[in-house]
Each structure stands twice: as structure tokens, then as C-alpha cells.
Amino acid sequence: MNNALTKYEVNNQMVWRGNLSKIDGSPLEKPVHFYIRPLSVENASQMGELSEAIYNNLKEGEECFIHKHSKEYYYDVFQNDNIHYIGVFVGSKLVGMSYLKVCHNEEELQEELPNSSYNFFKNSKREVKVASFGADSVLPSYRGNSLNAMMINYRMSLASRLDCTDCTSIVDRNNRWNMTPYFANRFNLFSTAIDPSDGGKISLLHKPMSKDTVLSNIKTRITLPYNRFELIDDLIKKGFIGVEFDKKDANVTFAHSNFYVSNIRRLPRVFDTRFNKNAFVI
């Protein structure tokens, strides 16, 4: 992780400054600052160039990780007041970016969190505003500096300033590199789906702003490889959610929660020692 961030405001907008630890995988002898701040239509051309550069550096099979957009797309996107783009700069160079979209109803959220079976707006006793996070994009030469995690953390702070009640995001199920920063920021893997835009398999992630945990009193923990999709889907149907990710072993740890189901599901009383002595049969 990088050195401590310096956080300040310019024209009522958050600006975070930190130090890079490496560029192109090589440690830096002298400090090099980066800045995270909001983007504007003036950055649209840089955003299009960054999107193209990142997409062109994807390996085979990673095409579903992000969507490539032109600078014309980014000029148009700033017409929507509910979308807030942020960027990571090294000097005047844009090296990373993402966005937050404030959703006020289920229809708006479905555009960002497709095929989610959980309705965040149904039967709520308070006004619900969901901050849906877009993909985190960083130039390959600047990876390894935890910039993804800091962009997530920045947007969580922005969501709080915008009075959002929840944060959500999607991650391609094969993109284990983006799982680490979301789980580090206490997001829950609560469902899986198919992205209608490209047919990719996605994990749906959520963090309630007002709760530290949504776990039930059932203490069972089950660990599975991130790519055992059928087993993971079966666990989710039984009321389990992903709560931790082991980057080294690429394993997801699941725990039980009643938060994402309309009623409590009855769990089988048979035990299985394939995963641990207290694991429910899957």
C-alpha cells in the first residue's frame, strides 16, 4: 500500500494526494506524486485516449473486463448530472479513472447492476440513493500502486457526501484482480448474473453505508476458489455471501446473511468436511 494520503478540498471538491511506489514494476528512488480528483468535460479527450490504451493492453479473454469508449462518448456522459467521473493524475497525465452513478430507482440501477434479483428500493422506510461504481481502469505501467483500492475509497467518501445509502458495483467473475480492493473496502458479493451488454459472467457487489456487517448469527465460514462458479451460485442460493478474498490463493470466503433474501432460508442440517468441519453441504 502507498504512503498515507493527503486529503484536501479545492472549490468544494475532494483532492487526494499520495506517492507512487513503482512505475512499470520498478521501485522509485524519488517520490512521485499522484492526485485523485473529479473529472470534467475538459478531460473527455484524455479519457477516450486512456480507455483505448487500457483496452488495447488487455490479454486474450479479458475483453469483458472493461468497455472501450471514445472521447465523443465522454463528452456526452457529462450531460448526466447523476454521473460523477474521477481520475488519477501523475502530473498532467491521466493514468486511471472510474465513475459513480447515483441511482434513484430500480430502473436506473438495473442499467448499472443488471439482472440483480434484489430490489434495493422495495419497501424501504427511507429515501434510497444507490451509488453504483463503474469499472476501475488503470494504465498497466501504473498498476501495483493500489490505485484501484484508493479510487473505490474515494468514491465511498463521495457517496457519503452525496447522501447515498448504498454502494454497488459489478466485477467480471474472471477478473480476480479487481476483487481484492472491493473486498478490502467491505463490499459483499451477494449475487451473480449475466451482463446483457456482452454476455459476460459478473459478480454483483454491495456495501450498505449505514451498516458495518449484514451477517447473521450463523458462524459458518466456507472458502471456495473464485472460479468455482457453480458451487458459488449454489452457496448464494442458500443465503451465503462473499465477504473476504485471499489474493494469494484466489479464494473467496463466504458467510451467512439474511439481508439479501425476502425471508430466512432453511439450511440443511447435514455437515460436510470437504471445506471445514462446520461447513453446510453444498
Region roles according to the model:
Residues 130-131, 159-172, 200:
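Conserved GNAT acetyl-CoA-binding A-motif
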Residues 32-50, 60, 224-225:
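A short beta-loop-alpha structural element at the N-terminal edge
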Residues 160-163, 173-192:
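Conserved active-site alpha-helix within GNAT-family acetyltransferase domains
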Residues 95-135:
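Conserved acyl-donor/pantetheine-binding loop and adjacent beta-alpha core of acyl/acetyltransferases
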Residues 135-138, 143-159:
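Conserved acetyl-CoA-binding loop-helix of GNAT-fold acetyltransferases
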